Each structure stands twice: as structure tokens, then as C-alpha cells.
């Protein structure tokens, strides 16, 4: 669980300074009073307590106790992503309606899953409250039960793998406008080749040589791209009694190959907000076993899995000061 009050997700900056610089609030209390006012006036919900707030880049998350139970309130000031966020929120509603364990957005009084808030000031109990210093895209989700995935629990990891396969299957059958989502339409051989030529920093030369060799011998992946989660890892997976109870954060959904999404999840599965370490091999194997219990990989996907896992692993190396051992894990 994140600490009470205000905190940062994965950034080593003072949260109070970030809150004021990015959103214009001079205190945690000012921000939570504004959240309470928005919930009352735009969603018809009564906030009883706002216990936690976390800032990540241009985004904020607030945990709220309300008359409708626990809520997770999310907003973003990244205006260039507003259309994408609206689409991903609609996608959440569609997935929840089909039984996928995701938080189903709570509809506002205007009948919307997500609202763009432009008004700087808002009135609550005859008190004028200062809102953010910018337009924000705002959504309200129910808080799901569970704890973040513990990758030492292999049964929970297998359950997470099975859940990812179910998400891929459901996304493939869900009719949504994919035009706003980023698309990885270039062939994998070309994408990886361009990365090797222009972006490989040489931190794991043996792994790079292995990737070059594997890439030279494989045929192009025989699979269509489709919507995938793109950030499936411990920080976005909730479990209870070794079973997946919730998958969070569909804000980074892209159009890509499912096996690439699985390979990326294998590499990053154990990462939380400030604890970034490579995923042990046994854990990766459990994730894949769980996935294939629902959707077995094709022969072409099986050939590509090792290549994609190696590529995502190379991209994960933070730099020369690799204290967590990402390079040695390859």
C-alpha cells in the first residue's frame, strides 16, 4: 500500500512541489477538497475521506472513501492524451461488462465515464475552491479488493498469466474505435533491426549478438496486431488467495502483437513503483504457463517469444549503473 497523504510514483522529487508546479494546488488538503467537490457536483457522490494521493508525471491518483464505497479517482493534465484516455476508459467499461476483472468506470451525472474539467473554481458549501491550474481529464473508478502481485507466489503468477490471456482474447472480440491508440504496424524484424542499429547502447553485448543471430534465422511473425495492455506488471495486478482479482491501468493500451505483450510482461512482471528488478526465470516460466493454459502460443509465436523477451530485456537495462542486474539477467 502507498503511504498515507501525498507521494510520488517512481520519481525522486518532493511531492508537494510537484503538486503545486503541475496542478496548482498548494497542499494535499486543497487538492482533496477540490476532489470532494467534483465528486459531489459532477458525480453525485459524497466523499467521506481522501486518504492517499499519488503523482506520476502529468497524472494524479486519489484514494477516496465515499458513500458508494472505496473509489480511485484519476486525472491527467496531458491534453495531448485526452482522446486516448477517453478511449481507454470506454474500453474499461466494455471489458468489465464482459466479466474481465477490471474497475468499471462510474458514470457522471452527465452520463459520461470521463469528464474534461475546465473550470478553475468550484463552489462547495458556499466556499469557493481553487481547482487545478489547467484543464484535466477526470475519471472515477471503484477500488478493487486485493494486494499487488507477489511474484514469489507462483500460483498467483500463473493466475496472472491466465488473466492476461483472457484479456487478450476479450480485447480481440471487443469492437472499439482503435484509431486513437498507438499502432505498432511495422513488421517485428524491421522494428527490432532499427532498434539494434540506432538505439542499442551496448550494455549487454553478448545478449545483443544473440538477438542479432536469432533475428537473422526467424521468419516474420504470422499473427495480426490487435489491442494489448502494454503495462502488465505487479503494480497493475491485484491478487487475493493466489488468484487475480483486478487488472489496472489501461491508459497505455496499444495495437501490437499479443506475444510481444506477453514477452514484455515477462520482463517487467516484478516491478512496482520504485522497486524495479528483473523477473527471475522461474517466475517468467510460471507466467507463460498460466497464459498458455488459456491461449497456447502458435508455432510462429513460440519462435518469436524468446526473441521478444530478449529484446524487451535489453531495452529494460537502465544504463551503466545497473545495480539491479538487468543486463546479467539476460
Label every model-predicted segment.
Residues 40-48, 191-192, 210-221:
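Short Pro/Gly-enriched beta-strand edge/turn motifs at strand-loop
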Residues 54-68, 72-73, 105-107, 215-260:
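Active-site acidic catalytic loop and adjacent metal/ATP-binding pocket
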Residues 111, 134-151, 193-198, 311-326:
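A glycine-centered beta->alpha junction motif in the catalytic cores
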Residues 148-203, 223-225, 255:
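A cross-family kinase active-site recognition segment
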Residues 259-295, 309-325:
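Active-site activation/catalytic loop segments of kinase-like enzymes and analogous catalytic loops
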Residues 297-309:
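All-alpha amphipathic helical-bundle segments outside canonical DNA-binding/catalytic cores
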